Swiss-Prot record:
The keyword Cytoplasm applies. One of its GO terms (cellular component) is cytosol. The modification Phosphoserine is found at S55, S85, S89, S96, S141, S154, S189, S412, S438, S578. This is Trimethylguanosine synthase. It catalyses: a 5'-end (N(7)-methyl 5'-triphosphoguanosine)-ribonucleoside in snRNA + S-adenosyl-L-methionine = a 5'-end (N(2),N(7)-dimethyl 5'-triphosphoguanosine)-ribonucleoside in snRNA + S-adenosyl-L-homocysteine + H(+); a 5'-end (N(7)-methyl 5'-triphosphoguanosine)-ribonucleoside in snoRNA + S-adenosyl-L-methionine = a 5'-end (N(2),N(7)-dimethyl 5'-triphosphoguanosine)-ribonucleoside in snoRNA + S-adenosyl-L-homocysteine + H(+); a 5'-end (N(2),N(7)-dimethyl 5'-triphosphoguanosine)-ribonucleoside in snRNA + S-adenosyl-L-methionine = a 5'-end (N(2),N(2),N(7)-trimethyl 5'-triphosphoguanosine)-ribonucleoside in snRNA + S-adenosyl-L-homocysteine + H(+); a 5'-end (N(2),N(7)-dimethyl 5'-triphosphoguanosine)-ribonucleoside in snoRNA + S-adenosyl-L-methionine = a 5'-end (N(2),N(2),N(7)-trimethyl 5'-triphosphoguanosine)-ribonucleoside in snoRNA + S-adenosyl-L-homocysteine + H(+). Optimum pH is 8.5-9.5. The modification Phosphotyrosine is found at Y146. Residues 631-846 are annotated as: Sufficient for catalytic activity. Residues 156-171, 564-578 have a biased composition (Polar residues). Changing N808A: Decreases catalytic activity to 11 percent of wild type. Residues 367-382 have a biased composition (Low complexity). Changing N731A: Decreases catalytic activity to 4 percent of wild type.
Length: 853
């Protein structure tokens, strides 16, 4: 019998002033129940009880074509339902007259939630696809690198040349395959294209990124210029290379999917300005080097300081791979010469050399060259990537060279300013003025609680602060669609105006066009007849001749208000035309008198007959629809009190067996607990521990008492009003559990010291419906008797107390009932996604997390 949907939302610690060590733990939970079917039955005015648990479902499905049931079933626990929990007399009157109570679709939130779920599923599917695609790229890259490692491990230049030729042949064969097989292009071409772009990107920026990260990991240390060759750092370097490689590959894939593109910088081709080196380098401080590294674990460096016997091999390798590195001055001069000879009108343009890398947020240095593979550097400097000018592949060698160094070339222009990398805000990032931690505030505003400044229980001073830890994800989003009786912030609606000052174009309805044509056809004989009648009746109807179209409208479409209100223009035009006909066509009256009556009779006979047939069909349909429907009017005692009308519509949600003889007094209509909420509370008490006796200190007409008895517990029902005791006994007999309840007419404040029970249920009077108008409900001053006093007396009976309170009760006062260092669970009771009440549980009734039990 417990609620189907119950969740633990948050834990809130309340710290007492001057006693920070004695904090009170407040467990916050939410319970959701629904009774839309019972409410719909109350609106229909009858109730049929069957043997099943879903009472009244069959009757609801049979009547109204299953409308009410369909409406109820279309709302789940997360949807936004009609404002059906509380209907005033005016709304009830509007509903009975068939007028709408609201505008817009009821299922707006459900449609929004379905669309959000679909969007989330698509995002998850895309992420899985990207991850799978990335894994395939990783596997292929590893396989290729291992193959390159096996070939480059040997010093034989012929094997390297053979490998380069094989690689070129493979790429060419792949391109040919893509050209020959267009259908396979969708699966192969994106992968090949992304791989090539990534290789270009990594060859251009990878070295700088590796070396910069290596320096950040080892600050203040004397770094080796070749950590990949140093035995102590070789293994660490390989791990460092692998981590950064796959990290930036993933980032590259992500940013490329977001629409970013990578274009290698334009510069002269390497082969154009590759110059022959001479053996008599006099002042070469930085020697020519060759980068043959494709895998970090096997770097191969060729230095021109080696013996003369290996110079020939070096030259062959340089010609085969074209990975040449000169010192900065020679490269600059070679660039200027080759670019001038290659293209007469092409000149080196000075551009900013600091470009932002989308994937890494890094930028290439400005000191005369681009970043390089850090494992291909041979300098003894601690920052070799920043000072060398080499490239890691022949295809990209000497690309992206922004401008020449200051020694050669045109120095008339100043260097471009160094641009700082711009930080692009992602779509899910918050603005600077937004608070990123708004979901985790210390006030617990997302819970919908009310905090007041009333007196605390047990002499506790005010609470210094609160700490809230949310236990449920997306609390803000879920709370947004719950009606917690607070002001809802609506989004601003923007009205967009066109730049051109033109009149707005309204699309004309097809039905309206047909009606205009019909009226034009009908008004031709009617205007002539009206003119005849106006001349033969002593000008009595002269003033009304301009309204012939209106008279015809009433004869043709009697009762059709839509066309009369929305189409005034045709009437005006027709009146003007009819007046013109009276002045200009008087001489044709005699000739038309013979034809007008025949046409008019045809129209006036056919149209009313069709309208009469439609009216009769509608009346017959309504009679069949209302056939066998039993409508109960308001009882005299309810009709005499207009403010009880809306509670009468909710009678089945108060007692599902209302028609079996349930009786209520005026105060009982206001104070009785809805049956579904009472059923949830009783079920929770019965499931907490073995409970035999429950005291209902303020039983009223027996709403909670009956539900406690239905769970099998014995109940002591107490109330000071003998009328309510009689009503509660009658209602218990209707449910057949009067033998499990002991009714006592007396004052709980006087009887508390003589009672013994396992659980005490407190639901004192809240002062009528006016309790909801208060911003915060003070449980000490706004209840009679005093809320603190009845709790103190209940503690003498047992520590297991259930306190049933209004939804706007002061949470600080409720928490203070637990005492310093104590615990309390405050449960919000939602009825059809609307916050109705809160229930405070003390003692063993608290549902603690599984880790604490």
């Amino acid at each position: 019998m417990c609620c189907e949907k119950w969740s633990r939302v948050a834990e809130m610690f309340l710290f007492i002033e001057e006693r920070e060590d004695c904090k009170i733990l407040c467990l916050c939970s939410r319970a959701f129940v629904e009774d839309r079917k019972l409410y719909n039955l109350g609106l229909k005015g009858y109730y049929i009880r069957d043997s099943g648990n879903n009472s009244g479902d069959q009757a609801t499905e049979e009547e109204e074509g299953g409308y009410s049931c369909g409406t109820a079933e279309s709302h789940d626990s997360k949807g936004i339902g009609l404002d059906e929990s509380e209907l005033d007399s005016e709304a009830e009157l509007m509903r009975s007259m068939g007028l709408p109570l609201q505008f817009g679709r009821i299922t707006a939130h459900k449609d929004f939630e379905v669309s959000m779920n679909t969007r989330n599923k698509v995002k998850i599917k895309k992420k899985k696809h990207q991850k799978k695609y990335l894994d395939e790229i990783v596997q292929e890259s590893w396989r290729k690198e291992y193959e390159e490692d096996d070939i480059l491990a040997s010093d034989d230049p012929s094997s390297i040349e053979q490998y380069e030729n094989t690689r070129t042949y493979e790429l060419q064969s792949k391109k040919d395959t893509e050209t020959e097989n267009p259908p396979v292009e969708n699966t192969l071409s994106p992968k090949l294209e992304i791989t090539e772009k990534w290789e270009k990107y990594w060859n251009e920026y990878g070295g700088g990124l590796l070396w910069q990260s290596w320096q950040e990991k080892h600050p203040g240390q004397a770094l080796s210029s070749e950590p990949w060759n140093f035995p102590d750092t070789k293994e660490e370097w390989e791990q460092h290379y692998s981590q950064l490689y796959w990290y930036y590959l993933e980032q590259f894939q992500y940013w490329e999917a977001q629409g970013w593109t990578f274009d290698a910088s334009q510069s002269c081709d390497t082969d154009t300005y590759t110059s022959k080196t001479e053996a008599d380098d006099k002042n070469d401080e930085k020697c020519m080097k060759v980068d043959l590294v494709s895998f970090p674990s096997s770097p191969i460096m060729v230095d021109n300081d080696s013996s003369g016997t290996s110079d020939k091999d070096h030259s062959e390798i340089l010609d085969g791979i074209s990975n040449i590195k000169l010192n900065s001055e020679e490269v600059t001069q070679s660039q200027l010469d080759s670019c001038t000879s290659h293209d007469g009108h092409q000149q080196l343009s000075e551009v900013s050399s600091k470009r932002e890398c989308p994937a890494s947020g890094q930028s290439e240095p400005r000191n005369g060259g681009t970043n390089e593979e850090s494992n291909s550097s041979g300098n003894t400097n601690t920052d070799p990537p920043a000072e060398d000018s080499q490239k890691s592949s022949g295809a990209n060698t000497s690309k992206d060279r922004p401008h020449a160094s200051g020694t050669d070339g045109d120095e008339s222009e100043e260097d471009p300013p160094e641009h700082k990398p711009s930080k692009l805000k992602r779509s899910h990032e918050l603005d600077i003025d937004e608070n990123p931690a708004s979901d985790f505030d210390d006030s617990g505003s997302l819970l919908g609680f009310k905090y007041g400044s009333g007196q605390k229980y047990g002499g506790i001073p005010n609470f210094s602060h609160r700490q809230v830890r949310y236990l449920e994800k997306n609390v803000k989003l879920k709370s947004k669609y719950l009606d917690m009786r607070r002001q809802i912030k609506m989004k601003n609606k923007h009205i967009f105006f066109t730049k051109e000052s033109e009149k707005p174009f309204f699309k004309k309805s097809k039905i309206l066009s047909k009606v205009e044509k019909f009226l034009t056809w009908v008004n031709k004989p009617m205007d002539e007849e009206a003119s005849q009648e106006s001349s033969s009746h002593d000008n009595v109807h002269d003033a009304s001749t301009s309204s012939d179209s209106e008279e015809q409208d009433m004869s043709v479409k009697k009762g059709d208000d839509l066309l009369e209100t929305n189409n005034p223009e045709p009437e005006k035009c027709q009146s003007v035309s009819s007046a013109g006909e009276l002045e200009t066509e008087n001489y044709e009256r005699d000739s038309l008198l013979a034809t007008v009556p025949d046409e008019q009779d045809c129209v006036t006979q056919e149209v009313p007959d069709s309208r009469q047939a439609e009216t009769e069909a509608e009346v017959k349909k309504k009679k069949n629809k209302k056939k066998n429907k039993k409508v109960n009017g308001l009882p005299p005692e309810i009709a005499a009190v207009p403010e009880l009308a809306k509670y009468w519509a909710q009678r089945y949600r108060l007692f599902s067996r209302f028609d079996d003889g349930i009786k209520l007094d005026r105060e009982g209509w206001f104070s009785v607990t809805p049956e579904k909420i009472a059923e949830h509370i009783a079920g929770r008490v019965s499931q907490s521990f073995k409970c035999d006796v429950v005291v209902d200190a303020f039983c009223g007409v027996g709403g909670n008492t009956i539900q406690f008895a239905l769970t099998g517990m014995r109940v002591i029902a107490i109330d000071i009003d003998p009328v309510k005791i009689a009503l509660a006994r009658n209602n218990a007999e209707v449910y057949g559990i009067a033998d499990k309840i002991e009714f006592i007419c007396g004052d709980f404040l006087l009887l508390a010291s003589f009672l013994k029970a396992d659980v005490v249920f407190l639901s004192p009077p809240w002062g009528g419906p006016d309790y909801a108008t208060a911003e915060t409900f003070d449980i000490r001053t706004m209840m009679s008797p005093d809320g603190f006093e009845i709790f103190r007396l209940s503690k003498k009976i047992t520590n297991n107390i259930v306190y049933f309170l209004p939804r706007n009760a002061d949470i600080d006062q409720v928490a203070s009932l637990a005492g310093p260092g104590g615990q309390v669970e405050i449960e919000q009771n939602f009825l059809n996604n609307k916050l109705k009440t809160i229930t405070a549980y003390f003692g063993d009734l608290i549902r603690r997390p599984a880790s604490e039990t």
